[in-house]
Amino acid sequence: MQKSLITTPIYYVNDIPHIGHAYTTLIADTLKKYYTLQGEEVFFLTGTDEHGQKIEQSARLRNQSPKAYADSISAIFKNQWDFFNLDYDGFIRTTDSEHQKCVQNAFEIMFEKGDIYKGTYSGYYCVSCESYCAVSKVDNTDSKVLCPDCLRETTLLEEESYFFKLSAYEKPLLEFYAKNPEAILPIYRKNEVTSFIEQGLLDLSITRTSFEWGIPLPKKMNDPKHVVYVWLDALLNYASALGYLNGLDNKMAHFERARHIVGKDILRFHAIYWPAFLMSLNLPLFKQLCVHGWWTIEGVKMSKSLGNVLDAQKLAMEYGIEELRYFLLREVPFGQDGDFSKKALVERINANLNNDLGNLLNRLLGMAKKYFNYSLKSTKITAYYPKELEKAHQILDNANSFVPKMQLHKALEELFNIYDFLNKLIAKEEPWVLHKNNESEKLEALLSLIANTLLQSSFLLYAFMPKSAMKLASAFRVEITPNNYERFFKAKKLQDMVLQDTEPLFSKIEKIEKIEKIEKIEKIEKGEEALAEKAEKKEKEKAPPTQENYISIEDFKKVEIKVGLIKEAQRIEKSNKLLRLKVDLGENRLRQIISGIALDYEPESLVGQMVCVVANLKPAKLMGEMSEGMILAVRDNDNLALISPTREKIAGSLIS
């Protein structure tokens, strides 16, 4: 049996879990169930990261010891995953003695190999990210030095430190990613990583003396003032939990096929530091690093100061665990940022779950009972519905193919296309008419086709919505097991069936208006409504345009707006807002345009996008870079969106 490892990041215990943590962990649980059903022996690992300066500070504010504080928050994470019925095999804490032993032994190995040396570090330290920022990449704003990753203020520090020779692994890392093009998904994230490596890697500070709450160095180092840097400590959890260098039950056979699920904010640590550490320790590198985006709340980034951080457990208690799983995994393409709203959640529940799937099963059970006393033979399906059977199998196979590519939203979209297809087939064939016309053989073939297809679909649905899938399969007296997966889903074997009633899969949520009223009350409580009314009042007070505000058609014609195709996109050093774009305007060269959209768009996501460009704007220098045009965009409150043609156009096409 093939062994594999699926991990979440270990979650930092400076705060309680929110919907972002739940999203990551639900993805991992989905993959665990998917690959287990296919016969793999999967080890699903999660846990908590409990060392570092932030934990020390948070504990001090609460008059607790760091360990007592970590105990309380770690328990909240574990309880939440138990509430969601997540099928994890290991829950690791970096305060576990076995983990400490692994980290100290790994440190010794790397030191003896010559990959760790002692020196002095001077630089801008970000407490939030627990890392130093390269001086060339910090953002100097109003005499404050901001972290390029989180934009928080940094502190200039100088301290003695041990360093890991990260620079020695530039070439091996690039070779690894060249040989393994799908090692990071989505692929544009891999391009982002290799671009970063190609700029040159600095050796990495891996110990601290400025705080005490961390794993001490091995005793033989005889250097008690140092503790291990949080990222070396944290990343080694993926190995320590499997018994590496610590005497625990050895499960390292799982390690060779590791899939790490991470958010885009910790991509660099997992895609550069982690494989370099593994190379130093002569351990196999991961199979895949799966990188997801962030969740916003109704267009606004989650923030404690705004009071819009969502508790996934409370949402699940209100709308259902399975329903929330479906929404989070279906609503947004994996890798991209997604926006959460209760209204969208309710619409998904009512339309997709209750209407498309729930009502379909109810209709089938009702007709099977009425016309055949629940007993359906499959012998005539191929005689009456060969094309429909082939199409159903094709849709299911397509849905299944998206999961290994980490296109989970497409897998669910295609899976629910099956239910749409079957509902339309019922409407087209009108089984009540077949019954009226005494075409019982054809009617039985139709209902048996629907029953067999629903049963087959339950084996793919299981990964995403396990309880609903088991309930669906129970209507056909079948259990969800690896053996039955082979028989019903993989082999697509048609079955004679005796159906049975089951409790409804889902319940419709009534009165969306009521939800909107609740949300309005919540907004008023947060003061958002008052701000909106103030802005609206200000807008109304604006005077209508006078004749002096108008421009003539001749003036407008002076502005040359063209369709542009973005060919390249890069960040500009020392700026957290500007991107350097190379744009095709149908000329014999690419135009360089400097655009202030870096806070809203990742560079890699822009390549290949059509945009609208003011092409005859006078060239100007921004941050020492020449800009030969302007990309048009629209801003709504804090959200910025590029203006693009609704259909593909030839680069250089004039907009009029």
UniProtKB/Swiss-Prot annotation:
Belongs to the class-I aminoacyl-tRNA synthetase family. MetG type 2A subfamily. The gene is metG. Keywords: Aminoacyl-tRNA synthetase, ATP-binding, Cytoplasm, Ligase, Metal-binding, Nucleotide-binding, Protein biosynthesis, RNA-binding, tRNA-binding, Zinc. One of its GO terms (biological process) is methionyl-tRNA aminoacylation. Its EC number is 6.1.1.10. Coiled coil: none annotated. It is found in: Cytoplasm. This is Methionine--tRNA ligase. A motif ('KMSKS' region) lies at residues 301-305. One of its GO terms (molecular function) is tRNA binding. One of its GO terms (cellular component) is cytoplasm.
